[in-house]
Amino acid sequence: VIPMPFYINEKMYLEGVTLTQEEFYEKLKKDEPISTSQPSPADLCDLWDKLLRDYEEIVHIPMSSGLSASCSTAMGLAIDYNGRVQVVDNQRISVTQRQSVMDAKMLAEAGKSAAEIKKILTDQKLDSSIYITLDTLKYLKKGGRITPAAAAIGTVLNLKPVLQIQGEKLDAYAKVRGKKQAKRAMLKAMKNDWETRFKEYASDGEMCLQAAYTGNLEEAEEFKKEIQEVFPGMEIHMDPLSLS
């Protein structure tokens, strides 16, 4: 895993290496200036060169090309490795990106080549959904995704956006009043996907449900229970990312 760099007050940090998630969110709450970046080409090539001393091939799974330039950077660098580095753009992020890594590991253990793994993961790129809700509209406003006026109205009316990722970009799914309604909207969307888009996977027992959160474990555990009520018998994997 290569950490993603970000800048706070113009000082660079590495995710999970030089700053913990708790420290990051504490600085975020204090409105310290934060910007994101991507791993440098030199760091990425150094990692690949190190791995290729012990392995024949690499399957590199970056964030979705629609959400980060790190994917196109990796693809450009991989050209010089004559096929030994296969970069997968299967439009995944967060828990679905993690699942792609686990799937790639399973395929490698089954004897698939790096090129074969890339094709399988790419062919399955639309076989996932992410639904996200946010506590505040402040960061959408700061990132330019909504106007200050829309953020102000949303705050006054206690509107909570529900966002979705089905493909390469983050899109609006619904706007509801309060977090309770936002969670209900996500559960309804998940149930609909289960019964329509992923019906065949569900009937074959090949579905995977995951929940993620940021700095709110207690609330995330409660949401996990709500998911289990809708999908009894399903194991829910938890990741400390965002309440999603």
Question: What spans do the regions from the language model cover?
Answer:
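N-terminal glycine-rich anion-binding loop in soluble enzyme alpha/beta folds
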Residues: 1-39, 43
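Mixed-charge interfacial surface used for oligomerization/domain docking
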Residues: 1-7, 11, 57, 66-86, ...
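A short glycine/small-residue-enriched secondary-structure motif
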Residues: 20-25, 48, 53, 75-80
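Generic surface-pattern signal
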Residues: 29-33, 53, 126, 195
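Short catalytic-loop micro-motif centered on adjacent basic/acidic residues
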Residues: 35, 60, 87
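N-terminal glycine-rich phosphate/adenylate-binding segment common to multiple enzyme folds
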Residues: 43-71
